[in-house]
Amino acid sequence: MYLLIVILPLIGSFAAGFFGRFLGSRGVAVVTTTCVSLSSIFSCIAFYEVALCASACYIKIAPWIFSELFDAAWGFLFDSLTVILLLVVTIVSSLVHIYSISYMSEDPHSPRFFCYLSIFTFFMLMLVTGDNFIQLFLGWEGVGLASYLLINFWFTRIQANKAAIKAMLINRVGDFGLALGIMGCFTIFQTVDFSTIFACASAFSEPHHYFLFCNMGFHAITVICILVFIGAVGKSAQIGLHTWLPDAMEGPTPVSALIHAATMVTAGVFMIARCSPLFEYSPNALIVITFVGAMTSFFAATTGILQNDLKRVIAYSTCSQLGYMIFACGISNYSVSVFHLMNHACFKALLFLSAGSVIHAMSDEQDMRKMGGLASLLPFTYAMMLIGSLSLIGFPFLTGFYSKDVILELAYTKYTISGNFAFWLGSVSVFFTSYYSFRLLFLTFLAPTNSFKRDLSRCHDAPILMAIPLILLAFGSIFVGYLAKDMMIGLGTNFWANSLFILPKNEILAESEFATPTIIKLIPILFSTLGSFVAYSVNFVVNPLIFALKTSTFGNRLYCFFNKRWFFDKVFNDFLARSFLRFGYEVSFKALDKGAIEILGPYGISYTIRKMAQQISKIQSGFVYHYAFVMLLGLTIFISVIGLWDFISFWVDNRLYFIYIVSFLFINI
């Protein structure tokens, strides 16, 4: 049964890819949805056996790579962390498959779409169940490939081509860091198996275990953790390598829901949680993680407030929430981070699928400024979007409230510079999150309509196959946090005993529960309320004042700064990409490939031999005394060298003769 959880999506993808022509669009949808749904049912059974009954399971299939000291096998590890991710991935993927049956019904290439969705799910399951870094890396690269295929599903659109290539290239940076981290792990531990590495982590955390670089020693565990974290930065869209995430909206909306809620972006958070025994012995790496996560949450929240594309606003909210998960790991509370990941999957999938219903009803229009007044036309979709938005901002007693507020309280009770930095940036991000969430609701559903009459006349609410996943996700967005809080992050729980590791000095969960002042606990709620009030005022009360501010010099520059995403794309394109392209052409291609390599290679050798042949041909004059003179000269030089060899060797290094000969050969070039 455990292996079927992983294999079933692969079978569905195989059937859709190779037999889609015979099964037809509806047959492919039924087969793939059935396979993923069965996988989700088995995941629920595995959750009961592994997590609730505390019975971790390890399955070793067969050896994979065996070479001298390097050994990697096909193995599957099912512990509490794994089964939580299995639940999230398979359930959300099942709902996305059901939703896509109706959403993609008019697309002629829907069999290919379902094939990609299923293979995406398979690679994510391979990633979370792997028992070694090599198998994890296989799933890691697989979800990158599947995301490229899904973002570029409508491959005739140039923007989809650009977005897919951008996602692939930016993730290559993070993947390179992860690959170096895996190599570092093997260098230190002589294995890539999680169980062996984590068991030996404390022994190798001493300062005398280091990597030597540029004659400087660097703590080995810290270097490995930083490199692994670079991989997470790329995959989980942290600041610096985040620019691919908003552009990934060029794919179909169900793809966005799957990428942002269950797969791809959650892989980085999962990997940090999986490697918690390593990160716990590297305080410096944890500080870096905390700062990067806090800055990401703040950056993405401020960027989302002035985006006009419906899906991009939700995409930046994903980026911001990932920042919360990352800095929760940075303050050594991996359980709360994974809990927030699970809660986030519910309301983020709900938001994206609700946005898909709006786009579907509005004839593929995504600009919120061209919507408005849809609450009366799409009451069901409006209710679903409202539930998702309230859960996102942490409205009391909804799912998001039980994890986001705990993360902020933990950051406050860390009592360190990094903890305070994360708390205040996270709290300010709550204000901006509330602002752009209510701005989205106002512009899309409550503001006076700006739509074309023909679009409004054809506007319709979600059909039944699209409504069922929305209803189930709405229940999850309301109740999951309340139902799972005590089990996953309650005081004294041993839910994570077989998967996560926290040093005793980093345990602050009990302190955050009882030592946090009441005013600190109320700050997120106050900021959420303030953000919603400001959003209402800006869009309904002081609209003329905002227009005057926006058209002023300062206001226009501020608007451009946030609307253009802090100019990250401009910096990357104008300074980094252009510089690398210029270097590649001027130096690598012209100076090296067509320059030095050609001179020292085929062109230079042929040119030199041709010139030498021309010079030697002049010696062949046809006169015997010329030949006799050359023979005498050569014999004299030969005898002189033999006789004076000891004297010459004393003054000239023999190894320089090769350089002299080569220089003589190329002296005429």
Curated annotation (Swiss-Prot):
It is a multi-pass membrane protein. This is NADH-ubiquinone oxidoreductase chain 5. It comes from Marchantia polymorpha (Common liverwort). Belongs to the complex I subunit 5 family. NCBIfam families: NDH_I_L (TIGR01974), PRK06590.1 (NF005141). It comes from the Eukaryota. One of its GO terms (biological process) is ATP synthesis coupled electron transport. It is an enzyme of class 7 (translocase). The chain crosses the membrane at residues 3-23, 50-70, 81-100, 119-139, 178-198, 211-231, 253-273, 286-306, 322-342, 377-397, 423-443, 464-484, 522-542, 628-648, 649-669. GO terms for cellular component: mitochondrial inner membrane. Core subunit of the mitochondrial membrane respiratory chain NADH dehydrogenase (Complex I) that is believed to belong to the minimal assembly required for catalysis. Complex I functions in the transfer of electrons from NADH to the respiratory chain. The immediate electron acceptor for the enzyme is believed to be ubiquinone. It holds the Pfam family Proton_antipo_N. GO terms for molecular function: NADH dehydrogenase (ubiquinone) activity. Keywords: Electron transport, Membrane, Mitochondrion, Mitochondrion inner membrane, NAD, Respiratory chain, Translocase, Transmembrane, Transmembrane helix, Transport, Ubiquinone. Its EC number is 7.1.1.2. It catalyses: a ubiquinone + NADH + 5 H(+)(in) = a ubiquinol + NAD(+) + 4 H(+)(out). It is found in: Mitochondrion inner membrane.
